[in-house]
Swiss-Prot record:
Keywords: GTP-binding, Hydrolase, Nucleotide-binding. It holds the Pfam family GCH_III. The keyword GTP-binding applies. Belongs to the archaeal-type GTP cyclohydrolase family. This is GTP cyclohydrolase III. One of its GO terms (molecular function) is GTP binding. GO terms for biological process: biosynthetic process. It comes from Saccharolobus islandicus (strain M.16.27). PANTHER family: GTP CYCLOHYDROLASE III. The keyword Transmembrane does not apply.
């Protein structure tokens, strides 16, 4: 699988130049440029995992190196600092992002040609979480969501996957297609979490299919998982 690691260069130095009354401004600018990055990424059929904001990951199977270069140039035009990128390859998203990260730290920047793989996207949703807000505080609900995020992250890490919190009670994960059965085994009898699985040629398609799967689970109300494949 192919993962593009993106590092915002001198990001900390940029934030410090904004003065002491800066946290609100940092959040404003971060959200503004992330909105633009999401828009650009969607045009190239991928999806940014924003993680730390100053370091991003993208699953880029199904995208040529030429397209990646165009996408990176488009992003650079909309960021307040420079960016450094590196393309990593591995049998799993976790291995691929590790290789991409090592590449960034070694100051390499050449894009090698790698074989494209199908992508498995996972759209997780917590059952009854919205309803539970009637009986708990906003912050306690957030703590529960955070704890589940940690548990899901650890599980996916063990099978070579990566995870991003989407907001609300939703999470987005990526695994290799070889690990899909492990996900199904884990959540087939789970009455707390449902997972929509999508398999596609690129990240955007896989995510769309995962969301389609999740909607079918919600409509069915009997299954905890469903899979759609391109």
């Amino acid at each position: 699988m192919k993962v593009l690691a993106i590092k915002l260069v001198d990001y900390r130095e940029w934030t410090e130049r904004l003065g002491y009354d800066r946290e609100w401004l940092i959040q404003k600018i971060q959200n503004k440029f992330m909105m633009k990055i999401h828009e650009i990424a969607s045009q190239y059929s991928t999806f940014p995992l924003q993680l730390r904001f100053d370091n991003l990951l993208m699953i880029v199977d199904g995208i040529t190196n030429t397209q990646l270069i165009y996408m990176i140039n488009d992003m650079q035009e909309n960021l307040p600092v420079g960016i450094k990128t590196c393309l990593g390859y591995g049998k799993t998203p976790l291995e691929a992002q590790w290789n991409a990260s090592v590449c960034l730290n070694n100051k390499e920047d050449k894009f090698k040609e790698y074989v494209d793989e199908k992508i498995a996207a996972l759209h997780f949703d917590i059952n009854f979480n919205t309803e539970a807000l009637k009986y708990t505080s906003v912050y306690d609900s957030f703590l529960e969501i955070t704890n589940i995020y940690v548990d899901l992250s650890r599980f996916l890490y063990k099978i070579g996957g990566i995870l991003q919190y989407l907001g609300g009670d939703n999470y987005l994960g990526f695994v290799s297609t070889n690990s899909v059965n492990k996900v199904i085994e884990k959540f087939s009898d789970d009455n707390k979490i449902k997972v929509g699985i999508g398999i596609g040629q690129n990240a955007r398609t896989a995510i769309k299919l995962a969301t389609t799967s999740l909607e079918k689970i919600r409509n069915n109300r009997e299954k905890t998982w469903h899979i759609e494949e391109e």
